[in-house]
Structure formats: structure tokens, C-alpha cells
Amino acid sequence: MRFKGLDLNLLVALDALMIERNLTAAARSINLSQPAMSAAVRRLRSYFRDELFTMRGREFVPTPRAEDLAPAIREALQHIRLNIIPWDKFTPDQSDRHFRVSLCDFVTVVLFQKILERLAREAPGISFDLLPLTDNPDELLRRGDVDFLISPPLFMSSAHPKIDLFQERLTCVGCSNNKQLEEALTAEEYSSMGHAVVRFGRTQQPTIEDCFLQEHGLKRRVEVVVSSFSMIPAALMGTDRIATVPLRLVGLFEDTIPLRMTAPPIALPTFTEAVQWPVLHDKDPANIWMRDIMVQEAARLP
């Protein structure tokens, strides 16, 4: 089919090349022969009057023009797949569906580990990419690059549906021999101590505790920034640093790592972890089933 002189099948080829960055792999992913894919590249170059890709070894490197085109093409194809083409029947125990989930390691060990255990029994063909949180999760959802985002709703866009999963609260931890934690911390002590903090993405986006502390006028003297909660203990051991982290996470750490816990100097509010999915996936039977599993397992958390 042509639209204003463009064979729309070529957009599928361009999208595959943007994903795979390799001619053979892209051809295989959309069931084309390599000669047919090469012909598609020639036609794309002719239509857009741009090279679109340059070769670096066997890798196809997109030009700026291809980078500009890719998001709109991906979104258009996603819309067709999810809203025009009929949904396939979804049978969990027979499915080989692959889900991409953006989340932090705290949610991985507290919640998603239980989901993985359950699905290994009930739907063993289901697979996952568990991806770190990024600077712009809304863009990932809009393009359909992830199936789910799990984070506090504060950091979610209003453009996509979401549902709450569980509540969590924050506590302070330090090395077990940190003498300053033998008594309750004052606000002044908390502010003057060295802190280890978690930041997400290349631009080190703030976390929920940053927002709470800012609301209460508390500042931290940050000495160490890490990219995941699992790195916090290493930043605390043998020092007088402290960290403000989710309480359930401390419960997992304390079985193997000598930490001391104390309450923050002010009563920080609880926060919510929610799951969000692309609006285009809202009626996808597999997506509906997966988010139901998440809600069920979250309800079982202690």
C-alpha cells in the first residue's frame, strides 16, 4: 500500500533496522530475505533523500534524519498493532510473551522476585527484561519501548494509565558500629552527617526521599552517589555515613549485612509504588493479565 508515494511496508523495515542496527537481523525479525531488505533500504534512501544509515563494520548507524524519523514511525506502527490489528488470544501457560519492565532494584527484590517465582510455575514461557529507571520514562512508554514502569506516581506522566501497588516508608541506616546512631538523630545531626544517596539515570534524577526532605527543609551532605539501592551498604560500611532508604529493603539487608537502623529526625510520610503502562496497551489481554499479577503479589507483601 502506498501513501503519498511511500510504500508503507518500508516503514516496518526502517523500524526493524533502527532496533537491530544490522541488516541480516532486521530482515530476519520481519521475515524478509536479505536481498529484499537491501532493496527496502535503497527505496527508503530514495524516498527520504538521505542515506539514513551508514556502515560501521556490520552495524548500521542511523543518520540524524533516521533518528528524527524513528520515534514517529515506531509510534504509528505501535498504534496499528495495538488498536487496529485484532488481539491474539492470550493463554498464560502457553504464551512466550516477552515483557520489558523499567523499575529500581528495590522493587525488583521486594516485589518482582515473587512475581518471577510465581510465573516460573504458572507461565514458564513468559520472559522479562528488567530495565533500570531512566531520565525520561514517559518517552519510553510513549514509544512502546517498555511495557511497564514501576515507580512512585509523583514521577509518572498523566498521559498513561496507572494503578497503585504498595505503600512503603523510609528509614535511616548506617554501619552497625556507627556510634552516632545509638540515639535518635536530631535534624541538625542528620543534616551534618555524610550521606550515601541513590540517583537514577544519566542526569541523576532525584528520588522520593529527596522530595520529602525538601518539603521539610532538610538538606543532606551528600558524600557518595550510587545508581542502585543494592550499592548502599558498600557506601556505608566502615564509615559514619548514613542513608535514607525504604524500610522493606533494610529487612532484606539485615540478614546478611551488619547495619544499624534508626528513625529519621522527622516523620516522613509513606510513599506509594505504582505500575504504569502505555495507553496503547490498555486493552492488551497480556498486559491486563500481567498487571493483575503485579497487583495480586503486591497485596501479599508483609
Curated annotation (Swiss-Prot):
Residue stretches making up the HTH lysR-type domain: 6-63
Single GO term (MF): DNA binding
Residues of the DNA-binding region: 23-42
Function: NodD regulates the expression of the nodABCFE genes which encode other nodulation proteins. NodD is also a negative regulator of its own expression. Binds flavonoids as inducers.
UniProt entry keywords in alphabetical sequence: Activator, DNA-binding, Nodulation, Plasmid, Repressor, Transcription, Transcription regulation
Gene3D superfamilies listed in its UniProt record: Periplasmic binding protein-like II, Winged helix-like DNA-binding domain superfamily/Winged helix DNA-binding domain
Protein name stated in the entry: Nodulation protein D 3
TM spans (from-to): none
Entry similarity comment: Belongs to the LysR transcriptional regulatory family.
InterPro entries: LysR-type_TF (IPR050389), LysR_subst-bd (IPR005119), NodD_PBP2 (IPR037416), Tscrpt_reg_HTH_LysR (IPR000847), WH-like_DNA-bd_sf (IPR036388), WH_DNA-bd_sf (IPR036390)
